[in-house]
């Protein structure tokens, strides 16, 4: 039997951004009950990615009280080394020079997912609905009617705001018909976990090579997370290699600055594209995180951008009488635009500038890297951006 239940907010998607949004809002609005519709039966989906959490993201997790249990599984980014292999361009950024102990932390997405999931279960005004898929919504004057599937049941309920945190293939976005602007970089990201002969000791590397940008992020137990951007053909070739040959290919591309690469596990590849929704709000609906934008991983900013979506939305709704009113959603969209332009502009320019071997461009980007190393105000501004701070 269909049943009707009223919630001030329904969040489609209980992944990282959806769960975080629910916690941020629930902690400040004890008078609201928030329902999360999560398609998986037992908690969030298993996620094998490794995430680079900006310092501002870590601060948010600390505020929510979930970082304490995660810290032992994370590895701090205390230094960043950026270089263009075979050229003079190189810059080093040290956290202590910018007044922080670390510019971020590296952690497995599955660990963070589980911690946020448990925190949601412990929150009395969050109702976690497993095996539940958002289907459609019909707006009215002061509410929006939602239909979702739970198991074999079709259930109807009403809410004041639907938050689409349901990923790149967002059903909330598709139900509205919001178009996406897409840039295909004609690259694939090859990701893997490397076992090293020595620890990275808090160093993260962004190495621009002839074959494509290659990032190494520090992990516990003398491991590193690899993100290697390659042409589709090159990515297929690399993925077809044996583990031994894959290690040799990585070592040849990166060099020996991080020491010897010994073993590889958890190899995968995925297409690298920029997706940005033409609007992020529509009649009592808002899309956030990967539902509204996905970025190239070159600067590790994608998830952190989604975290700032959650923070901004929760701050705007802190004193809202009706969370779905255009007054609040319009303010949300307006506030997020500058951050989108800034981060998308940064990542897009890095991809285009460092994936091109045209000689004048190579010379220009190396001068830019050297300038970044020599000019503290410019380096400080860049560091603040990577740490997720707006100023």
Question: What role is predicted for each listed range?
Answer:
Residues 48-85:
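N-terminal FAD cofactor-binding segment of flavoenzymes
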């Amino acid at each position: 039997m269909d049943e009707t239940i009223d919630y001030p907010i329904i969040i489609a998607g209980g992944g990282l951004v959806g769960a975080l949004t629910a916690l941020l809002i629930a902690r400040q609005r004890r008078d609201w009950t928030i329902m999360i519709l999560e398609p998986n039966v037992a908690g969030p989906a298993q996620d094998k990615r490794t995430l680079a959490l900006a310092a501002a993201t870590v601060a948010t997790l600390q505020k929510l009280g979930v970082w304490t249990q995660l810290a032992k599984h994370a590895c701090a980014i205390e230094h960043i080394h950026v270089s263009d292999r075979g050229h003079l361009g190189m810059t080093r950024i040290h956290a202590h020079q910018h007044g922080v102990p670390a510019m971020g932390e590296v952690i497995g997405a599955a660990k963070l997912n589980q911690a946020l999931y448990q925190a949601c279960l412990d929150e009395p005004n969050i109702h976690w609905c497993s095996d539940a898929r958002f289907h459609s919504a019909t707006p009215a004057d002061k509410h929006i009617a939602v239909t979702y599937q739970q198991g074999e049941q079709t259930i109807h309920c009403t809410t004041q705001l639907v938050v689409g945190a349901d990923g790149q293939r967002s059903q909330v976005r598709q139900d509205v018909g919001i178009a996406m602007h897409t840039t295909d970089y004609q690259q694939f990201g090859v990701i893997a976990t490397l076992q090293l002969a020595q620890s990275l000791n808090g160093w993260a590397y962004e190495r621009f090579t002839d074959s494509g940008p290659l990032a190494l992020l520090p992990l516990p137990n003398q491991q590193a997370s690899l993100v290697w951007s390659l042409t589709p053909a090159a990515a297929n070739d690399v993925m077809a290699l044996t583990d031994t040959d894959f290690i040799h290919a990585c070592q040849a591309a990166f060099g020996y600055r991080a020491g010897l690469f010994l073993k590889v596990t958890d190899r995968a590849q995925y297409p690298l594209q920029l997706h940005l929704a033409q609007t992020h709000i529509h009649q009592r609906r808002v899309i956030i995180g990967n539902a509204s934008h996905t970025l190239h991983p070159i600067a590790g900013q994608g998830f952190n951008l989604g975290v700032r979506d959650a923070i901004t939305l929760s701050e705007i709704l802190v004193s809202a009488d009706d969370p779905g009113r255009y007054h609040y959603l319009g303010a949300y969209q307006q506030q997020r635009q500058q951050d989108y332009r800034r981060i998308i502009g940064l990542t897009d320019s890095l991809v285009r500038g460092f994936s091109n071997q045209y000689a004048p461009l190579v010379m220009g980007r190396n001068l830019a890297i050297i300038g970044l190393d020599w000019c503290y105000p410019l380096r400080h501004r860049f560091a603040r951006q990577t740490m997720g701070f707006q100023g």
